[in-house]
Amino acid sequence: ASACAQPAPKTGSSTPSSINDNDTKAHANYEEKNRQYREIDASLPALAPVWPDRLPSPNGSDSPRGVIVDLDLKGGTWSLGRIPAGRDVRPPEDPVLAAARSIPGTQRLSWEGSNALIATFTEPGPLQRNKLKPAMGFVFISATQHHVVDDDGHVAVPHVPSASATRTWFVLHTPEHPRAIALLMPGMLGTPEGMLELMAKRLMARDIAVLRMVAQPSRFTEHAEFVVPDRESIPALAGHIAQVFGDRTAECAYAAQAAFEHIFKAHPDLASVPRVAIGYSAGAMTLPTVLALEPDAYAAGVIVGGGCHYWLISELSNYATMIDAIVTNWGRTTPTADLRSDLAEAYLAHAPLDSFHTASILKGKPILMVQAKADLAVPTELGDVLWERLGKPERWLREGGHESLFFQHLPKDLDSIVAWIETSAKLRERPVEPKESNQP
């Protein structure tokens, strides 16, 4: 059955604004690409989540799907770098390598490849000294088993399976008397750093602890290219694409779940306060799936600049070339509008962990969407579809595009977002500080 058989009306405005990130030429290019796809039917039934396997963790781990290593925070700041194409990956530092080797089934372990993102903790520079200092920092490591296949399709070493490791870095900020804890998930490549830091500071000022995902899991941006040889290959190829997107999104959920278990052991007081999640851009796209892994654990969620249908976002986004994570190569096939739409529909029918499907699990939960009316990075139309899939929760629409949403509007909205969290997650009142007395 066609995944988008019945066109749905677009609910968001895509009127160009005067902001540079939404100039007329950019919109014309976007509209030309967008016309090559049939619109997504937001009324389709949801697929049940299918969570990919990970190698089981050793006894005593905080997570059934991996291990966690506490890190030397140095000055509490970090740098992020992508692995260049064709560059050999150096093994990580000894404690991380040893922890990964403790996972059963990792006799042959490979690390991240081209375009993957790696974090390194560093001393703060002159412009970083006003950053919040974390209470702790750590990395979650999981491993996925696979077999090396030779040119004839046979398993090369059948008795020694290979495993690929993925890392996700976190820091924790906690006030003296926490009223809640917020998972803060960034956009691609750990951005926008300044707005993430501002949000963390506003939350901390209101006695809300912050578990900050430094960046998406290391393989989230790893380069993968899919070649479409002909129309007949589309169903199988769509399943493969959906598997890659699903695996990367699931890792976000697994890492967040493990991170909470880890910090609850170090800070037991955090286990008894409400938990919320905030996602920016790519973090907003994956937020429904992160919450879908353990929906009862979260009291509320905030989606800033998010959308659904990951493959279509990767095709339409004006950030696609810069990110260079998932590339669809049509080879000698002429990519007609029908072929593109067929692939988009087939992908959705094979992608149970796309937020298009996991959003239905969150219906009835307090969700706030903050969305730009003319977003070309996470297309507004796909944000509209996510809003419908979530059951049309509270939504604040802002003029302009993706950059103006985060750098023009979000700084003004931070206090209102925090107030929304306090109300929606039903946080206890902050204690009234006693007034100073002049009496002896």
What positions do the PLM features span?
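Gly/Ser-rich "nucleophile elbow"/oxyanion-hole loop immediately N-terminal to the catalytic nucleophile
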Residues: 235-281
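Conserved alpha/beta-hydrolase "acid-adjacent" motif
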Residues: 376-382
